[in-house]
Amino acid sequence: MIYKEKNIGIIGLGYVGAPLAYLAASKGYNVIGIDNDDTAIENINKRTNIPKELKGFENFKLVASKDYTILQKVDIIIVCVPTPTKNNKPDLTILKNVMQDLKDFLKRDSLLIIESTVAPGMTKQYVKDFLLKEKGFIVNEDYNLAY
């Protein structure tokens, strides 16, 4: 499999997601970024706030949007949303909302990577079970899951 022919979707364009999006795009991948923050989207689309290490790579294939439907074009989805802590427990509300929004656009044979910080076992416990229930997708048969 030649991965550079694959399209990558990155959900969450903050401190982790934006640099990852720029780096993947600078290496030749087509990258679609999703965020609900207009400023983050504008920074990507106007090529402002590019990490200094990636200056000069402004002409890469990278677009950002709030619209999850553009994820229909991607083969790899990386989730980089915050999981702030409350009472020493991660708040998974944002991750759960993303999974709800994402479920209709995850294709068979996709790779889903959860980059967000979650407790050990949470990816398997929540994400795997959610996709089985909502889509009937079985991990390692219908899609691949990494964390």
Q: What do these predicted regions represent?
A:
Residues 85-147:
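Rossmann-like NAD(P)(H) cofactor-binding subdomain of soluble oxidoreductases
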Residues 4-7, 109:
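Phosphate-coordination loops involved in phosphoryl transfer and adenosine-cofactor binding
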Residues 13-14:
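Glycine-rich Rossmann-fold phosphate-binding loop(s) that bind the pyrophosphate
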Residues 3-5, 26, 30-76, 81-90, ...:
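Conserved N-terminal Rossmann-fold NAD(P) cofactor-binding segment
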Residues 1-2, 105:
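Glycine-rich helix-loop-beta junction characteristic of Rossmann-like nucleotide cofactor-binding loops
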Residues 17-18:
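N-terminal Rossmann-fold NAD(P) dinucleotide-binding loop
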